[in-house]
């Protein structure tokens, strides 16, 4: 059964799992400096950092913001060794049951094949693509903004 377990940096084993998976799963321009992420995790009340478990097996992580009217998912990744096993689908189902307000996800523009695959995955699971381009402010000062939808 899928469940989310909130973590802080004091949960060393799980936090290390999350950080390593983040770095492995996303290019550097798509996540903030790790020291800033640690601060957000420990000190920002509406930022939620969770390990995704299937029973007792950690399978991934998800971070999201609670903005009162909606939730904004910042990062979601599963262990590469476990991908294509239905965990993404089951995690999204759990997410939609767990969070009772609208959920906003962000994906890069559908230019590259992986971006198209991500978009199709989310659409297959009930999410709608906003067909307007916009630019996300950079997570890191030295890296430019990213084109997203």
Can you annotate each of these PLM segments?
Residues 1-13:
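Conserved N-terminal entry element of GNAT/NAT acetyltransferase domains
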Residues 26-54:
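Active-site rim helix/loop that mediates acceptor-substrate recognition in acyltransferases
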Residues 49-51, 56-77:
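Conserved beta-strand in the GNAT
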Residues 78, 84-97:
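Conserved acetyl-CoA-binding loop-helix of GNAT-fold acetyltransferases
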Residues 92, 116-118, 135-141:
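Short glycine/proline-centered loop/turn elements that form peptide/ligand docking sites
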Residues 99-113:
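Conserved GNAT acetyl-CoA-binding A-motif
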Residues 109-132:
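Conserved active-site alpha-helix within GNAT-family acetyltransferase domains
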Residues 146-148:
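Conserved small/polar residues in nucleotide/adenosyl-binding loops
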């Amino acid at each position: 059964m899928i469940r989310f377990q909130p973590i802080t940096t004091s949960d060393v084993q799980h936090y290390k799992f999350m950080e390593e998976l983040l770095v492995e799963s996303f290019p550097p321009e798509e996540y903030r400096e790790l020291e800033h992420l640690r601060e957000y995790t420990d000190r920002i009340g509406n930022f939620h950092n969770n390990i995704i478990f299937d029973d007792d097996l950690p399978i991934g992580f998800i971070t999201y913001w609670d903005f009162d009217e909606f939730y904004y998912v910042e990062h979601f990744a599963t262990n590469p060794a476990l991908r294509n096993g239905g965990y993404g689908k089951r995690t999204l189902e759990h997410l939609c049951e767990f969070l009772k307000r609208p959920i906003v996800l962000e994906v890069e523009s559908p230019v590259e094949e992986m971006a198209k695959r991500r978009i199709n995955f989310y659409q297959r699971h009930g999410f709608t693509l906003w067909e307007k381009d916009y630019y996300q402010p950079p997570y890191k000062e030295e890296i430019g903004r990213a084109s997203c939808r």
